[in-house]
């Protein structure tokens, strides 16, 4: 897997841009069309997926050990040589818009965005990862190309590989594959901005007359990952309510 600092916090006012950019990586490369890419992976039973989250974007791959060379070359091609085909992008944008409309029918699908929007109002952590219909509809393939050029670089990127291989050989292989990945200007740390803590209790009610279920969140600002108690707090949180089997 490859992870980069290219998540939704860098969307600016173009909510959904990081997500669309990550998805568009698989729309073909300078060496393979989207169809050829999918056929190559299907033939060997491998997969390559892309994603964007709040803070990061990335690419993950699953494949048999014997196919490592082939798939790693595909990973490199997808990450470094995307063409951002305009027709495929428009199709993806329409699918995203349909998905955003469908999500409105399920409270649990949208509550994260409502909650983050209230808790982190005025901060980049309030940015909705999938975007909003009003912003996604205005994003162009040129916007995606610009975002890719600005944020898809080795600065701050990390590559992790788990499987049956010799560490030295794999390290040499990855170094060779990505040695020409050009560095750029590291993005500004837009998240390094104070978050205003609520001065009192806040309640946000979102009514949907035909809803068959009610979903609610209760919470507040947590601690920084750099806090020495972060892991302990995560464990306690998981015990109390972090999983289906929690109390």
Mark where each language-model region is.
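Non-catalytic beta-strand/loop surface segments
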Residues: 1-12, 30-67, 90, 99-156, ...
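Solvent-exposed, non-transmembrane alpha-helical starts
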Residues: 11-14, 69-72, 86-87, 172, ...
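Active-site SXXK
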Residues: 15-29
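A common structural junction motif
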Residues: 77-86, 177-185
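Carbohydrate-associated surface elements
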Residues: 164
């Amino acid at each position: 897997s490859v992870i980069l600092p290219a998540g939704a916090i860098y969307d600016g006012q173009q909510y959904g841009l990081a997500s669309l950019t990550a998805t568009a990586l698989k729309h073909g490369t300078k060496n393979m069309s989207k169809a050829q890419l999918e056929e190559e992976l299907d033939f060997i039973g491998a997969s390559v997926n892309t994603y964007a989250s709040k803070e990061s974007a990335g690419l993950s791959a699953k494949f048999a050990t014997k196919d490592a060379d082939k798939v790693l070359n595909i990973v490199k091609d997808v990450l470094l040589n995307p063409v951002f085909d305009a027709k495929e992008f428009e199709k993806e944008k329409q699918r995203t818009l349909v998905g955003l409309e469908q999500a409105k029918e399920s409270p649990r699908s949208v509550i994260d965005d409502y909650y983050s929007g209230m808790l982190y109002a005025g901060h980049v952590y309030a940015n909705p990862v999938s975007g909003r219909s009003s912003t996604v509809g205005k994003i162009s393939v040129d916007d995606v190309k610009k975002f890719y050029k600005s944020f898809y670089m080795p600065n701050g990127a990390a590559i992790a590989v788990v499987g049956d291989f010799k560490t030295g050989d794999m390290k040499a292989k990855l170094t060779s594959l990505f040695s020409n990945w050009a560095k750029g200007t590291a993005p500004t740390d837009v998240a390094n901005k104070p978050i205003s803590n609520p001065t009192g209790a806040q309640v946000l009610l979102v009514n949907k007359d035909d809803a068959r279920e009610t979903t609610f969140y209760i919470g507040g600002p947590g601690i920084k990952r750099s806090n020495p108690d972060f892991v302990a707090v995560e464990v306690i949180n998981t015990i109390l309510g972090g999983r289906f089997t929690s109390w």
